Amino acid sequence: MKFLLFMFVGVVHLLPLASGKAIYGNGPSQRTFQEIKEEIAHYGDVAKSIINLTVYGKAQNRSYERLALLVDTVGPRLSGSKNLERAIEIMQQNLKGDGLENVHLEPVKIPHWERGEESAVMLEPRIHKMAILGLGSSIGTPPEGITAEVLVVTSFDELQRRGPDAEGKIVVYNQPYTNYSAAVQYRMEGAVEAAKVGALASLIRSVASFSIYSPHTGIQEYQKGVPKIPTACITVEDAEMMSRMASRGNRIVVQLKMGAKSYPDADSFNTVAEITGSKYPEQVVLVSGHLDSWDVGQGAMDDGGGAFISWEALSLIKDLGLRPKRTLRLVLWTAEEQGGVGSSQYYQLHKANSSNYSLVMESDLGTFLPSGLKFTGSDKARVIMEEVMSLLQPINITQVLKAGDGTDINFWIQDGVPGASLLDDLYKYFSFHHSHGDTMTVMDPKQMNVAAAVWAVVSYVVADLEEMLPRS
């Protein structure tokens, strides 16, 4: 019954697109959906060649090995750090050495924050040293630290109800984890909301799908007119323990010390490379990932994997001697973790040409075994993407789902450009996200091969179609 329903919905959805009416393109170049479908079907052999090269051939494991070399050599790549600067220099050399075209750096001013030494110790009801990670842009504590009683809450609503109890205390958030989007607001806004009710500092339960006593960092934002207070993430285990203690009526006292400090903005770069289009070089399909990371772990998963399968996509296409009609542009963003700073400045620099962008792609949710593609665009563009994804039937990755947005491509999507991202294992991703556990040990070379194949097939075919993806 489910199959019949799917078939019925699919037929209804495609009727106006496949009825023979010339609805794609403008003027005499208008084509029916059936004609475009037949055009895409002709890429079957090209798709198989890309898959064979990366999954089974001489390019297998290449993206993994390239990534391992960079992160083992450079380490984590915090915005404003020497490590990030070195990684950008290395990647520029790598892309030139790979024979890609128009390799260059585009200057960006980025935030520079350092965490310094940090610690948290529970003094009452017992002595317990707590693992913490200060949040990006947080201020530090005085040198002697902040020693105060704790108020544990599970939501902003509870904090508002108990506001008078928070004054002069450290607010601990033990918000439940249902999904990242719901929980991350406590990391982003927890300090501001705690400061509004007179708290001295805030400690937030790490935004993680799983924990082995691992704190997870990330960016947080202060609000104009609200006092700035120190803020850090603690482990799921410590947040839950203090919540249990509070429910028993225990008095909890914590000493927090943080040496965090912000510096003037630093100079950085977005890293760009291309395969120039053969027929419409001014038109662009963009593939991307971010090169910066947090200062813990290696930044292998977030977002080394996404950056390196994006590089690999161009490498595979070049290795096969392919040159699409449109320009394939690789951008490795800087300072994504500080709120998409590099991609924002790129958009400001290039937005006058947004009508020439056929598709923007971002990989920043893991490069494990993808189950499909998330896509944002018009209905006409979506059915085209469904046909493109059907070319990946040999590796059984054909789904097209909604919500293809991402921090670094949202500017373009809001401007009407279709956007795409990989659909991946989010439970695994948020187990290691922004933590000491984000290392090469998390990565799997065979899974990266498959992710790279998907990225290369989609980007090449869309770049080589006779027409750009239709917009709303």
From Swiss-Prot:
It is found in: Endoplasmic reticulum; Golgi apparatus; Lysosome; Secreted. Residues 21-44 form a propeptide. Homodimer. The monomeric form is inactive while the homodimer is active. Its EC number is 3.4.17.-. Carboxypeptidase that may play an important role in the hydrolysis of circulating peptides. Catalyzes the hydrolysis of dipeptides with unsubstituted terminals into amino acids. May play a role in the liberation of thyroxine hormone from its thyroglobulin (Tg) precursor. The active site is at 336 (nucleophile). It comes from the Eukaryota. One of its GO terms (cellular component) is extracellular space. Residues 1-20 form the signal peptide. InterPro entries: CPQ (IPR039866), Peptidase_M28 (IPR007484). Zn(2+) 2 binds at residues 302, 337, 434. This is Carboxypeptidase Q. Pfam families: Peptidase_M28. Zn(2+) 1 binds at residues 290, 302, 364. The gene is CPQ. Keywords: Carboxypeptidase, Endoplasmic reticulum, Glycoprotein, Golgi apparatus, Hydrolase, Lysosome, Metal-binding, Metalloprotease, Protease, Secreted, Signal, Zinc, Zymogen. One of its GO terms (biological process) is thyroid hormone generation. It is an enzyme of class 3 (hydrolase). Glycans are attached at residues 52, 61, 179, 353, 356, 396.
